[in-house]
């Protein structure tokens, strides 16, 4: 069995740490919240993010970055996108050998429009890069941690890394498929969060299934258009990392992005909705990144543009809806 250091103690990092431990691997989690660290070590739980879930007793946690760095040659990066570059640079400064980096972040860097694997590669010295991959797909942490059937995709430019991810995580309740389209899998995971926020708004406003179905379908079209422009295989968006992740995130109250949108749809201001979130809603930040990226690439993304107006320009919801529905006639 292997050793894996998990950087990040949020809901998904915790759920995947539990999967790894149940698969027989040694797991050390790293985080900054002393209460969460003590709770994992003493009570085998992380109630701040997964209330009521009992974790494998073999999992340990630390706030000592060097301890986590030296624990293994395989790292699971389960941090918000905006925190990744700084943490990876700190890790890199302490390394003296190659490590494998597996990430589960679903975002795009605001300043550079880079995917998370590109951020990690940028922040690593070449001599420390033993391979970078992603694990992504329709996988709410709340369901994974109680062993409900889940399927996800593992992707890396290096087939050996994809296979490593599959071998580490796959078991009788978590099925892992390999996928060689890293660009598509990462973009699918990041871009669907935009549509999830919009889907939550639609639900919060009280609209029915017709509107929700239209939003997801046309949202997938937007994701595919930008994805192809950035080098993704369009077929990837019909798989787990695309429509699979889109469906689960746009239809569930487990989704923090859907929840953020729902609060806004019910009449809360954006600031009020954000202040009530216990965890990071990546879709908020990704909307801004992708809006500007689409403008730069001249890609038509009307849902993203409308959501950007709501989130960052205080465009009223009813006005935004009228703009979307009143666009010029087009073929599908």
Curated annotation (Swiss-Prot):
A GO cellular component annotation in the UniProt record: cytosol
Binding site for sn-glycerol 3-phosphate: 106, 137, 139, 192, 245, 255-257
Pfam families cross-referenced by the UniProt entry: NAD_Gly3P_dh_C, NAD_Gly3P_dh_N
Gene Ontology biological process terms from the UniProt entry: carbohydrate metabolic process; glycerol-3-phosphate biosynthetic process; glycerol-3-phosphate catabolic process; glycerophospholipid metabolic process; phospholipid biosynthetic process
Record-level Gene Ontology MF annotations: glycerol-3-phosphate dehydrogenase [NAD(P)+] activity; NAD binding
HAMAP family listed in its UniProt record: NAD_Glyc3P_dehydrog
Identification of the protein by name: Glycerol-3-phosphate dehydrogenase [NAD(P)+]
